[in-house]
Amino acid sequence: MELILLEKVANLGNLGDKVNVKAGYGRNFLLPFGKATVANAANLAAFEERRAELEKAAADKKASAESRAAQLAELEVTITATAGDEGKLFGSIGTHDIADALTASGVEVAKAEVRLPNGTIRQVGEYDVAVHLHSDVEATVRVVVVAA
């Protein structure tokens, strides 16, 4: 299935690229979420008319993500959790908890933007957590977990 990308898609291409994908990926993900359109003559002409508008929207999203990344770079978030004598938490700190703490600190962050490659946090300590704000913009935040 040949499609025209309407935005940058990870591991696939950039805005305006013509790509060949499997039919299921196109029908079930790219087309319904507005990330692509079918590559025919009418859609190609319509895309070329809207290209400047789409590029401006993509640049605005990236600029917004970069400003949020600059705010996050200065932040250090402290999360209090109940823990045992040896520093092991009763429960865990996940992406939702970190996103809530960052939002409370004044920077709007969605749960899906927080990346914990080693899984949830289960020990008291300091952690560097990646926040994926845009396909080209990633920030690192220091999260300090203390025992209550």
Curated annotation (Swiss-Prot):
Keywords assigned: Ribonucleoprotein, Ribosomal protein, RNA-binding, rRNA-binding
GO molecular function: rRNA binding; structural constituent of ribosome
Database matches in InterPro entries: Ribosomal_bL9, Ribosomal_bL9/RNase_H1_N, Ribosomal_bL9_bac/chp, Ribosomal_bL9_C, Ribosomal_bL9_C_sf, Ribosomal_bL9_N, Ribosomal_bL9_N_sf
Disulfide bond entries: none
Keyword Nucleotide-binding assigned: no
GO cellular component, one term: ribonucleoprotein complex
Taxonomic superkingdom: Bacteria
Record-level GO BP terms: translation
Matches recorded under HAMAP family: Ribosomal_bL9 (MF_00503)
Task performed by this protein: Binds to the 23S rRNA.
UniProt similarity note: Belongs to the bacterial ribosomal protein bL9 family.
Protein name stated in the entry: Large ribosomal subunit protein bL9
